Structures are given as C-alpha cells and as structure tokens.
Amino acid sequence: MVKITYISHSCFAVELEHSVLVFDYYQGELPLWDPEKTIYVFASHRHYDHFSKEIFRWTEQYPKIKYILSDDISEASYDASEICRSDLTRIAPNQTETIGNCVIETFRSTDEGVAFLVSCEEKLFYHAGDLNWWHWEEESIDYNRQMRKDYQREIRKLVRKKIDLAFVVLDPRQGGAAFSGIEFFYAERQGKPCVPNAYVERLWIDGSSAYF
C-alpha cells in the first residue's frame, strides 16, 4: 500500500513501507512519519514555490534524510553547512543517480531545473516539477511551437517506463491550453494513472491523502 498526501501547490508526499518521497516542498503542514524511515526530499528547481530552505530543518526530526536538489538551486540560497555532504545531492538534467534505495533519473524541464523519475521499493514515480507544455497567448508563435516540441521530446522518453503514478502539471493560468500537457502525457502513457499538480487547490485539500 502506498499513501499519497497533498501538501500544497506542487508538493506531494509518497509514503512507502520503508521510505518517504517528498517532492517540491515550499509550505504547508507535513504528516508525521516514522523516524526510522528514510526521507528523500526532492526540489526540482529554484522557484520559490518549489523550494524552501525550511526542508533542512527536518533533520532534527528525521535523522535518515536525503536531499536531492536540482543544480539550478544556488548553494548561496541556503545554508547547508550542518548537513553531511553525503546526505545532499545536486543533480542536473539527463542524469541517473542511485541514492539509498532510490534510483533517480532526471529530465530537462521546459522552464527551470528538472523533472524526476524515481524508482523506490519496486514502485516507479514521476514528478514533473515545471516540465510542462507551456503555451501563453502573449508569447510568439515560435515560442509556443518550441515549447510544444521540447515538452513532447521529454515525455516521449517516458513511453517505455512502467510508471506506477505520475504527478503532472495542470496550470489553469494557461486558459484553454491548460490541459495540453496532461492530455499529451496521458495519451502517450496509454491511460496510465496521473495526478494533476500545481495550482490545483480546487482538486485537492491541503493535507488530504489517498492510497493505491
């Protein structure tokens, strides 16, 4: 059984038998987890609503904690001096790293930083960060065409991956284009489960949970 908890904005926590994955925390109340579990904290990029140095305070409660940060997050933006270097990994697009019992693969975002594909305890999870089919009416035709091309290129890399659950951007600020990214993802994945994230307060209540 896997427990999914929505924290806020793009942040979800995935609780497994021995591990917890926390993606893109910036605010909100966390559940209480067994301190014997290993906590993996992911930050996909530097935007204020995807990263907070608050995460480094969690070491007081959870001694088995690992941080995986996109390399666009400047080291000057946080004080990680008290964190053992072996507990913090900076990661770039198109990398694969094994950290603890997780195998982590990254993809290039169409905005900043990376998207994560994480294999943990025989489950495979995808978190988009800000990798999305961004389309803005105020931008040029060439800009929007390039965004479509870049997004589709990255998502097609996932076609053969047996993802158990995916967290995919749904941003209503895009108006009629808001569903383009998640619809393309869903079609390429042949209807496999995906969870909308980012600006989805109408769909989720902070702190709400689901199991699968």
Where are these regions (language model features)?
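Conserved beta-strand hairpin/beta-sheet module of binuclear metal-dependent hydrolase folds
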Residues: 1-33, 114-139
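Active-site metal-binding loops of divalent metal-dependent hydrolases
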Residues: 10, 25-27, 45-46, 72-73, ...
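Short loop/helix-cap segments at secondary-structure boundaries that form the rim of catalytic
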Residues: 13-16, 30-37, 58-60, 75-83, ...
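Divalent metal-coordination and catalytic microenvironments
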Residues: 14, 45, 104, 130, ...
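Active-site metal-binding motif and surrounding structural segment of the metallo-beta-lactamase
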Residues: 27-75, 156-174
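Portal/gating segments that form or line small-molecule/metal binding sites
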Residues: 56, 62-109, 114
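Active-site-proximal loop/helix segments of hydrolase catalytic cores
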Residues: 110-183
